Amino acid sequence: MLCWMPALGQISGKTYFGFDRNEYPGDNLVPALHRSFSYAGYWLNNPPESNSNGWTGKRAILKANGFGFMILFNGRLDTQLTGKDAAALGRSDAADAISAAKREGFAPGAILFLDQEEGGRLLPEQSAYLFAWVEAIRASQYKPGVYCSGILVPDGSSTISTARDILSHEGKRPLALWVANDACPPAPGCVLPKEPLAPASSGVRDALVWQFAQSPRRPFAHRCAATYAADNNCYAPGTSHSPQSFLDLNVSSSADPSGGR
């Protein structure tokens, strides 16, 4: 059984719930989703393992229904970087992200998040790619952000998360982080709690967004498995359980984390 909090995703303490998923849910489902969520993930290019992007051209309908945005560009996996000029690919992909953001109508100053799918400490080629992308966005009319894991993993005699690795490189330079940490705890599972849920609980103090539940449920979330549906996915309230309606859950101190309205 899923436990949900009604009404627009806003709870006390000025935090807001949002959703993301790889496939666009369909125009008909957008109003129902806004009853629970204030913002949506918005892909600028093909999402992971997809050959097309159903989000293209959907900014207007989402905005008309009151949604803010988390603007996302699908980055490259390590296998796509090994043996190549990773920094050059980062700059080229940043240029593609900038062009796509302009085409979709996102104004200057919006945050573009790079989707860094693989967790742990960045390998040299991953680091070269990611930071070249970040610097190219930083030099444009947009602001850089990264979607990455906040889950600690073994790193020699210590532990590391992708988020901490990135922050140690960036120092005090501004970089928005959308942190994925669905481990229970700190994540509550597939619920929208009545109590304020702080992005800092992701394990990254200055996280702009915390993704705290994913579909399908991962082993990290086994302690809160009962909060997910029987098929191990997470669904929005008031929607049927279907391939069009499972999603990931996020919380932020902003109702428009990317400033995309």
Question: Where in this protein do the model-derived segments appear?
Answer:
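N-terminal signal peptide c-region/cleavage motif recognized by signal peptidases
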Residues: W4-P6
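Functionally critical loop-and-helix segments that line ligand-binding/catalytic clefts
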Residues: Q10-E23, V30, A163, L167-R261
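Substrate-binding cleft of extracellular glycoside hydrolase catalytic domains
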Residues: I11-S140
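Flexible, glycine-rich phosphate/dinucleotide-binding loops
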Residues: E49, D78, V153, P216-R218
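Acidic carboxylate-rich catalytic motifs and surrounding loops in phosphoryl-/glycosyl-chemistry enzymes
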Residues: N74, C148-L152, Q214
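Distinct, well-ordered alpha-helical segments
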Residues: P124-Q126, D155-I166
